[in-house]
Amino acid sequence: MSWLSKLMPSGIRTENTPAKKRSVPEGLWEKCSNCGSALYGPELEENLEVCPKCDHHMAIRARARLAALFDLDSPTTEIAAQLGPVDVLKFKDQKKYGERIKASQKSSGEYDALIAMRGMLKGNPLVAAAFDFAFMGGSMGSVVGERFARAAEVALEVGCPFVCFSASGGARMQEGLFSLMQMAKTSAALGRLREAGLPYISVLTHPTTGGVSASFAMLGDINIAEPHALIGFAGPRVIEQTVRETLPEGFQRSEFLLDHGAIDQICDRRDMRDRIAELTTMMMRQPHPQDADAA
């Protein structure tokens, strides 16, 4: 350091005086993947991960989704939380399945890709499940199927509606036939609900594909989708490569499916709680629920 630098006040910088780096906390700002706007993290979280500039629905964690659904002043009970995946087949591709499980559990903070809970929605009992895409792309393995089936059984015991928010890449290939069996298992669980006359509402979010879309995700008494969600069995690129034709614009998006009768409604995530409360009240022939938010 030169004699001039020693005499210079610390608040004055020159080209040769390095500026102190100001660290920005991780996650404080996020960029909208649709319009590119810089979004303040806490405000985006409060808006349920929906861009306030263009209304683009970004990914949201399963627990945040369920917390936004249930009444805040009522307790919730997680269903089959103790269940965790097991590498029965000792599957290995580029990495061992057991290692993938541990890595996903560490990065996501969840034991598997589906969270199921029992709680209250505007004063009425409800069972709901939500996929966490952060865990291995929301893929469906044995634990996902078992948690879904147990959640349906709880709804059957309580005598209340069942809601599932899907966000999945499909069946988990590392579990082979054990994963494919969950398609039949979950569908059978919904059959028991149907026999009891209890409603099942399926909410399809971005993306809902593969074995999940080919089973319980499309079996709702009412199928609701979030705006511009990708919904289908195979992805559009795979289909184009197979049929060697250009697909229509917006193919497999929720708006396209609504126009062609594949789903019943499209609902903004911020309105989803009120919409589900309205539908379940009507389907259960319950008195108009007390608005827990206003209480």
From Swiss-Prot:
Residues 28-295 form the CoA carboxyltransferase N-terminal domain. Keywords: ATP-binding, Cytoplasm, Fatty acid biosynthesis, Fatty acid metabolism, Lipid biosynthesis, Lipid metabolism, Metal-binding, Nucleotide-binding, Transferase, Zinc, Zinc-finger. It is found in: Cytoplasm. Its EC number is 2.1.3.15. Residues 1-20 are annotated as: Disordered. One of its GO terms (cellular component) is acetate CoA-transferase complex. Binds 1 zinc ion per subunit. Component of the acetyl coenzyme A carboxylase (ACC) complex. Biotin carboxylase (BC) catalyzes the carboxylation of biotin on its carrier protein (BCCP) and then the CO(2) group is transferred by the transcarboxylase to acetyl-CoA to form malonyl-CoA. Belongs to the AccD/PCCB family. Acetyl-CoA carboxylase is a heterohexamer composed of biotin carboxyl carrier protein (AccB), biotin carboxylase (AccC) and two subunits each of ACCase subunit alpha (AccA) and ACCase subunit beta (AccD). HAMAP family: AcetylCoA_CT_beta. This is Acetyl-coenzyme A carboxylase carboxyl transferase subunit beta. The gene is accD.
